[in-house]
Amino acid sequence: MFGSKRLKNVKEAFKSLKGQNSETPIENSKASFKSKNSKTSTISKDAKSSSSLKIPISSNNKNKIFSLAETNKYGMSSKPIAAAFDFTQNLLAIATVTGEVHIYGQQQVEVVIKLEDRSAIKEMRFVKGIYLVVINAKDTVYVLSLYSQKVLTTVFVPGKITSIDTDASLDWMLIGLQNGSMIVYDIDRDQLSSFKLDNLQKSSFFPAARLSPIVSIQWNPRDIGTVLISYEYVTLTYSLVENEIKQSFIYELPPFAPGGDFSEKTNEKRTPKVIQSLYHPNSLHIITIHEDNSLVFWDANSGHMIMARTVFETEINVPQPDYIRDSSTNAAKISKVYWMCENNPEYTSLLISHKSISRGDNQSLTMIDLGYTPRYSITSYEGMKNYYANPKQMKIFPLPTNVPIVNILPIPRQSPYFAGCHNPGLILLILGNGEIETMLYPSGIFTDKASLFPQNLSWLRPLATTSMAASVPNKLWLGALSAAQNKDYLLKGGVRTKRQKLPAEYGTAFITGHSNGSVRIYDASHGDIQDNASFEVNLSRTLNKAKELAVDKISFAAETLELAVSIETGDVVLFKYEVNQFYSVENRPESGDLEMNFRRFSLNNTNGVLVDVRDRAPTGVRQGFMPSTAVHANKGKTSAINNSNIGFVGIAYAAGSLMLIDRRGPAIIYMENIREISGAQSACVTCIEFVIMEYGDDGYSSILMVCGTDMGEVITYKILPASGGKFDVQLMDITNVTSKGPIHKIDAFSKETKSSCLATIPKMQNLSKGLCIPGIVLITGFDDIRLITLGKSKSTHKGFKYPLAATGLSYISTVEKNNDRKNLTVIITLEINGHLRVFTIPDFKEQMSEHIPFPIAAKYITESSVLRNGDIAIRVSEFQASLFSTVKEQDTLAPVSDTLYINGIRIPYRPQVNSLQWARGTVYCTPAQLNELLGGVNRPASKYKESIIAEGSFSERSSDDNNANHPEHQYTKPTRKGRNSSYGVLRNVSRAVETRWDAVEDRFNDYATAMGETMNEAVEQTGKDVMKGALGF
């Protein structure tokens, strides 16, 4: 009568999982990842259980049972500010404002390196596949080893660093200084080169001008013997081999030339300052970017200016006396430009980042698709001018937020060269508030798909607005996780080190809600799960809206795998774990789904409170948390929600309304404003809990909905069975429990066994047997805890010095000296100052008192959760949470570290000059010659073993790039291979994501691309052979 069919349905949902992924071992979900000096926490089951997988602990001295230890971290300790990607090892490094470097690899691979100086990091570069060079805000250079995962050396540069460049295959870092000098640092030998350039702008071009810093440096993408250097007023190419300036580029605007800014002062000569310069991937052209938004294209060999333009205007360097520009309209200033290329480096585009015009305005990115570059040898300057003046297409990508961009990182798919812009499929954007956005390129679609990156980055993509943790029965949890395996993760590098695990009866689910309406559910002890197993639901799709989606409350029914989520507008969506009836292999709506598409309108167009949204399930997910019902009550913001384990959902609103929903209908079985209840002094309900226990002296147990209010009152309702399988709700009592502010948490336990009295389906089924469970309700107020008996006046009180952030009951299984098993029920409290204590109940005897060993933001600590196994998940800050254990283990587990560097992966062959440049006299400089040139004949041997380890990882020719063991790291010379020749593994990833987000991108003429590559290479090789024969090379 009480829904035994429901339990059967839950079991049926997992039958399909038994034969699925049977070859993939799914391990227990309890974490063993630990910080130094920490001990792994223990898992126990409800005290009612007669058996336990718990490691025995003597309970003769309870003080020896409890000990605080951090067992895992999630997210980052502070705001991310810089990023770098290593194509060779396929690793992503993200640095924070407090000097931490997080290096991520495949699935859950992560290594954190903390620098001694806690200053913000401003730049990072991977070098030779084994080094990571880090520069902080104090211009200190750190060299980190991916092999040993340590800081190898610290370098103090003689001056302020204004620009750097490195190359994935070279030992050297070019450093531009504030005084205009360029020095060279030998990363492998840890020494500065004797080679140094003074301020060339002052010595060779503008001796009267003030001292200019170097604003931009770049290695020639085809010739390591040449570098591109920009000062404020001159850009030049410099030959390291010949030790001389090869060509100079000075952008001057004659009178009446409009230029790139919107100034009216066009009647005089101007020289806009340079902010950046870049080589075309073929090294034959360069672009200089100026502070007035001018984009100036030059012939790198002759120094001829080909075209000066802005994003929207051309020939801005030509005098136009009658030109009128609206000076009241301000153009967004260019902050940085990236010269992208596809698989064939002759097909290029510009990605331009703009600053916001005024504070609070949205930033945007602009893509100028230039298409295939005309052949240099047969195209006139006029032809090249037309090429740059008439791009194939232009796209503007507005950011979904008005937060400024602080760092942009293209993720290349083809090679680490061309400044990391070789066929990128994804662009990583770090915003000023620490949020990370990911944009597919060249489509410009923004995606927050959680499985692309490790789970610890989920806190930042986008920012988490709320979080919670819950204990889930392990068999149920592992079965669900097996359906959540995601194979579309972007990073492939590193090796996850196997963690030792302890037997566990319960797993821990961590749930985060985000500003874009997404909710992620993942295993909090992912040290035992090798995959990116996570669930993701998106309220934007379900509610068909794009704004006001920030998630503010989440309730998770762990034993029935149901979810209730509310957003800032007060809309609530109910989800349940099940097979998706709308799943499509093609990931596209079927032709007969026209009616479903018509129903995808906003909830504002609906009159009912409960809206069926099952047809809004994502078509690309076979099994997971599917939307079932949206609650559109128009009652304002929610103040509390609770999705019980017996099918009832309680929703309270800040305006005072209280609603009870039976999910089985669904149906609203109760709705009333508590402000209208006689005797109630409160304005709204602040927490809801469902318990099964005796009320007063009834002599039998009932389903009770217990509500705490903002004025410290407890309102109790009985949920009674009615005819036709329905339920009635009866108000029983209103009790004033505390006078200090709102009630934050309600829990309940049995007087006799101390086991939990929270409502579950097995307890619900036993109601028909007349079982009577005398229980005690635990009420957490502002700074006190009270134990009350519903329907009676008896209570016990415990006060605290500081406000309470989180409380909860835990059930610890212990073993006596005579090997008798005993269950210990305790209450764990966390005060807002980070003080954590453990008490026995109901006598409140203190068993442990410890402080969390690091600062915790008071704004976020209230999102902490006490788990039933003695763990507590604490949200430390906006970007991080930690899992602590309060139970001391007999066996301590040694901390382990993941492997980052994989030996044997070859660094791709660096592109070289083409036949025309060769014939014109360009001297190709080999890496060995460059080492001798910059390091001298007596260059010392490397002081690091990393140098020896990485020595054989360089490809001497393009055919060496192939590595059968690591196909995702290949870099292959373009050949005729058919339609998919330009596809890498990351391209497939990005295209899969585009499909999943219902955004089908054009194929960009793959066949034409492949044919173009083949023909270009054939002509290039033929010309090279002819020249070599004719000139005697």
Swiss-Prot record:
Gene3D superfamilies: YVTN repeat-like/Quinoprotein amine dehydrogenase. It is found in: Cytoplasm; Cell membrane. Residues 18-27 have a biased composition (Polar residues). Keywords: Cell membrane, Cytoplasm, Exocytosis, Membrane, Phosphoprotein, Repeat, WD repeat. The modification Phosphoserine is found at S591, S602. GO terms for molecular function: GTPase activator activity; myosin II binding; small GTPase binding; SNARE binding; syntaxin binding. InterPro entries: Lgl_C_dom (IPR013905), WD40/YVTN_repeat-like_dom_sf (IPR015943), WD40_repeat_dom_sf (IPR036322). The keyword Repeat applies. Signal peptide: none annotated. Belongs to the WD repeat L(2)GL family. This is Lethal(2) giant larvae protein homolog SRO7. It comes from Saccharomyces cerevisiae (strain ATCC 204508 / S288c). The lineage of its organism: Eukaryota, Fungi, Dikarya, Ascomycota, Saccharomycotina.
